[in-house]
């Protein structure tokens, strides 16, 4: 999969969600918009914020469009004007979360070891948002099912983040910052799998799991520089 690199926003956007609706990304990444477009983007972001709160508190299945609509002073029809279905709204919430992670990583998106450091920072941040972590864990597992409405979203997401992570290891190798003999593709797959697995374990035992610490302990032996 090719990753767009036309400008800073493109490079940041492509990190996790290559097909994210543009208006949500403009708000999530801090890009400037004007006029009616800005008003529409702001309203959509308000809906996404409300949905994130509802879904992370009571779960996606129990969370209703009515509750989301009430939080932003709209009718259900008003919400559906911006998002055609509950599934579309969920995708926007997940994409917005990825946008926040991208901002933590840096703009423009860092390369090499700096990218890996950004993933550790993202893990630290995730420990402050248990509801959103739980939402991601549950929906990403459900999204592996054939025919699930978000299967395509997660397929694209994992392809994008895996590609960037592999490129980070490859760049580190070019700079002599990666231990010789390290398989960059395997290291990237293992790192992403570790991040996902740690989120599940952390949800079950948050007082016993240090997600960022465990990521550092995995990465440091692979590097010739301090993480």
Per-region residue spans from a language model:
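N-terminal intrinsically disordered/low-complexity leader segments
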Residues: 1-42
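Hydrophobic alpha-helical bundle segments that form small-molecule/ligand-binding pockets
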Residues: 14, 23-24, 147-148, 159-187, ...
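Helix-turn-helix
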Residues: 42-46, 50-92
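Hydrophobic alpha-helical connector segments
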Residues: 92, 103-134, 184-191
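Short, basic, alpha-helical segments at the C-terminal edge of helix-turn-helix-like DNA-binding modules
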Residues: 95-101
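Amphipathic alpha-helical packing segments from all-alpha helical-bundle domains
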Residues: 102, 114, 129-131, 148-175, ...
């Amino acid at each position: 999969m090719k990753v767009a690199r036309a400008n800073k926003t493109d490079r940041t956007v492509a990190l996790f969600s290559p097909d994210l609706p543009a208006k949500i990304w403009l708000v999530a990444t801090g890009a400037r918009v004007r006029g009616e477009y800005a008003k529409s983007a702001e309203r959509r972001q308000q809906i996404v914020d409300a949905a994130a709160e509802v879904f992370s508190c009571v779960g996606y299945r129990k969370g209703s469009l009515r509750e989301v609509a009430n939080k932003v002073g709209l009718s259900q029809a008003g919400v559906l004007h911006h998002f055609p279905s509950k599934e579309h709204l969920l995708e926007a919430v997940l994409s917005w979360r990825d946008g926040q992670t991208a901002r933590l990583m840096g703009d423009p998106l860092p390369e090499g070891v700096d990218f890996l450091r950004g993933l550790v920072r993202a893990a630290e941040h995730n420990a402050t948002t248990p509801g959103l972590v739980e939402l991601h864990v549950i929906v990403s597992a459900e999204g592996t099912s054939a025919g699930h409405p978000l299967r395509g979203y997660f397929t694209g997401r994992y392809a994008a983040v895996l590609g960037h992570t592999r490129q980070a290891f490859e760049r580190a190798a070019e700079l002599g910052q990666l231990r010789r003999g390290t398989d960059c593709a395997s290291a990237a797959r293992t790192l992403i799998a570790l991040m996902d697995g740690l989120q599940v374990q952390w949800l079950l035992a948050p007082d016993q799991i240090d997600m960022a610490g465990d990521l550092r302990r995995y990465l440091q032996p692979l590097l010739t520089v301090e993480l």
